[in-house]
UniProtKB/Swiss-Prot annotation:
Gene (UniProt): dapE
This protein's name: Succinyl-diaminopimelate desuccinylase
Cofactor (UniProt): Zn(2+); Co(2+)
Domain of life from the UniProt record: Bacteria
Keyword check for Nucleotide-binding: no
Length: 386
């Protein structure tokens, strides 16, 4: 059994359902400290939702050394119905060339692969020309309030600079390394409450139906072309996720209706400009309303440069593939790290089974992931030596 597979299985066997860490960080710290990493625990959140975070850094001598950070999460989503699993989700199980277990793809394999890649890289290059750090959290699959976000805020307060970040999210589609994420769209949610006047449904002249009033405005928002996107991002999208109105009775005009919606926005728009345009539409339709906004993350983009080139070269050397740069999909903790790090790239194993019953990874894909990380480290070292 390879060292990477062994560490992956050890991590899967720890039932770290968000926000629980279940001992993952202790296991990883034990592997990192012999390599010279100073490990700092940065826990956050109330006792009822305590989040475990680890900041591990290996620093060299000399001023203004660049810093590479690997970001990952030890927490996993809930298992779902246990009876639907072919094998216990926290018992690593091999079947038909695949390793089954919750977190196999998202993202315990990536964490194990990077740690082993570090072991191999530092054995051959004990004094690299850049510092290396890991930022690991047990709050990525949950609210993401007390995890990476808190650590990034602390690093910013301390003036710690990050230059390159690899996020180990599962990004591959058909083959290992065929796609990496060099950016993500921003996300912003709104909760709109349109006010009316409740009344008997047989006497509409004595009431004001907020659903009827809201519909033209919602139709206009749904039809709006917010921007045209660009070479890296599709156009910004606006979608309604929930609508709640009425008392449950069939003869009552409701007094208010609440609409939840979400923007996924690209770098052609800002959160502020989108908010202004929404308010303009609502005001144009003469609605009496309240609107609360929640910004989940700003968009970020890493154009081809030092880190993207290193990852592409590593994938090419390991697999022969010319990887696709993509900004599709949901958000990740990269949105927080991008606030203090100008180059952020996500690269990891297949995302085909993430969050599903019988989550798994093809065993033959595990070593290539580790090798891609190791080759990226080697390529960054080569670039710094030039």
């Amino acid at each position: 059994m390879s060292r990477t597979l062994q560490l992956t299985e050890q991590l899967i066997s720890l039932p770290s359902v968000t926000p629980e860490d279940a001992g993952c960080l202790e296991l990883l710290a034990d592997a990192l400290q012999p390599m010279g990493f100073a490990c700092e625990r940065i826990d956050s959140g109330p006792d009822s939702f305590r989040v475990r975070n680890l900041w591990a850094r290996r620093s060299g001598t000399g001023a203004d050394r660049p810093v590479l950070v690997f970001a990952g999460h030890t927490d996993v989503v809930p298992t779902g119905p246990l009876e639907q699993w072919s094998s216990p989700p926290f018992v690593p199980t091999h079947r038909d060339g695949k390793l089954y277990g919750r977190g196999a793809s998202d993202m315990k394999t990536s964490i194990a692969a990077f740690v082993v890649a570090l072991e191999e890289f530092l054995a051959e290059t004990p004094a690299p020309s850049f510092d290396i750090a890991l930022l690991l959290t047990s709050d990525e699959e949950g609210p993401s309030v007390d995890g990476t976000k808190v650590v990034v805020e602390l690093l910013r307060e301390r003036g710690e600079r990050l230059d390159w970040c690899i996020v180990g999210e599962p990004t591959s589609v058909e083959r290992t390394g065929d796609m990496i994420k060099n950016g993500r769209r921003g996300t912003m949610s709104g909760r709109l409450t349109v006010k009316g006047i409740q009344g008997h449904i047989a006497y509409p002249q004595l009431a004001r139906n907020p659903i009827h009033q809201a519909l033209p405005a919602l139709a206009e928002l749904a039809a709006t072309r917010w921007d045209e996107g660009n070479a890296f991002f599709p156009p910004t999208s606006w979608q309604i996720s929930n609508m709640h109105g009425g008392t449950g009775a069939s003869n009552v005009i409701p007094g208010h209706v609440t609409i939840d919606f979400n923007f996924r926005f690209c770098t052609e728009s800002t959160a502020e400009s989108l908010q202004q345009r929404v308010h303009a539409v609502l005001d144009h339709h003469g609605l009496e309303y309240e609107l609360a906004w929640t910004i989940g993350g700003q968009p970020f983009l890493t154009t081809p440069g030092t880190l993207v080139n290193a990852v592409q070269a590593a994938i090419r050397a390991e697999t022969g593939l010319e990887t696709e740069l993509s900004t599709t999909g949901g958000t990740s903790d990269g949105r927080f790290i991008a606030q203090i790090c100008s180059q952020v790239v996500e690269v990891g194993p297949s995302n085909a089974s993430i969050h599903k019953i019988d989550e798994h990874i093809v065993v033959a894909d595990i070593e290539p992931i580790k090798n891609i990380y190791r080759r990226t480290l080697q390529e960054l070292q080569r670039q710094q030596a030039v």
